[in-house]
Amino acid sequence: MSRTIAAISTAGYGAIGVIKISGNRSKKILEELFKSAGKQRIDSDKWQNKRLYYGTIEQDNRVLDEVMAVYMKAPHTYTREDVVEIYTHGNAVCQRRILDAVIDEGAELAEPGEFTKLAFLNGRIDLTQAEAIIEMINAKSEEAFDLALQGLAGQNERSIGNARVRLQEILVEMAVNIDYPDEDIEEINYQKTIESIEEVIDELDEVIDITRKRRVYRDGIRVAILGKPNAGKSSLLNELLMEDRAIISDIEGTTRDVIEEQILLSGIPITLIDTAGIRESDNVIEKEGIDRSYKAANEADVVVYLIDSTKGPDGEDENVIKRLRADSLVVCFSKSDLPMSAKNKENKGLFDKSIDISIRNKSGMEELKSELRKIAEEKNVAKTEGKRDRTVYEATKAKKSLNEAKKALKKGLSLDFAEVDVKNAYAYLGNITGDTASEEVINKVFERFCLGK
């Protein structure tokens, strides 16, 4: 017998809280706890599908809250099971009491993501849409939300589905020619099969591009701002944030700890990390701050290294840069509105590329932002190449198999060789939608969800 599950679907405090119940006992539980405005129980056959009812939730003759409630009949629900939603006041104590009452009536506490997992298992959505739901919940910008919404609408699902249908047609044609070589059937046309495979590859390229774009707007990058004391790190942080977040002072070593804040650049989330100025120091507290600066820099995707234009780069700057493990380095010369000596101009040429910035007159800021946006896009493309992004990983493997199938067909080899690769590609695409994904993969997708979703 299937479980009836329940959870609080809203987070924290607010005007309204939502208790969600799914399963074949949902309606029965509502009948036991809900009383209409006239203090009457509603008979089972009187509950209307998707109608909102006003009343109270009561247990042991005690009113728990004044609520609105709705019963939604399967299969036209989020989980494709009978679903009940109870709209309570948003106080956490009130919501907890009602959830406890629901559990007392036979429901079980839902696991994180279990409602959406039911939607997947019952065929309402596929794995790509489940991932789009979690991206919508966590979206930090309008661009990220819109891209996730396209995913929920089945953008990748349709593309992958179309690709699998085409591969299935190719496999059927191959199987007939392999299994019945002596029968009076039309011989497979290698060139047409190659063209069909190329069409599938083109479709997969689109899926990969869309997924990479979604990742850029979903994950963004971490940017550590590094440099000597008084190079202008905190001023740069405040300028990018457009608020006075970090203390600015002419006294060296003012910033002793790491400060993290987030901004959006054209919808891309950028985590900015202001660090303590790096120099030789005997001060125990300052040395700890400097160690944390290096740690933050080496864990970041990008380091923006600031050099005071009026002082120019020296051997100490070179030593610091050599210690950095960050993949991307952006060298900026701060205070560019002030005069620079001929020697400093000469030393500046030691760097292949640098950006002159001035917080006072705002120069160079757009160039720096543009560079960070560019790096964010490149970084997230690189990240999707590995197993970290399931869709890109599986689609790339499918492309590789299809290219191997093309090679075999172009060489005129037996269809058996190409068939193996096409079958592999078909299975890889099934892993994306969940049709052939392992239980472990499915569980990992839903582990990312919160309670009540």
Task: Write out the residue ranges for each language-model feature.
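C-terminal-of-GTPase-core extension/linker across diverse P-loop GTPases
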Residues: 3-11, 142-264, 281-283, 312-453
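Inter-motif core of Ras-like GTPase G domains
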Residues: 286-310
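Conserved G/P- and acidic residue-centered "switch" motifs that form tight phosphate/ATP-binding loops
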Residues: 123, 230, 274
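Switch I (G2) and immediately adjacent beta-strands of P-loop GTPase domains
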Residues: 53-65, 69-73, 253-281, 299-302
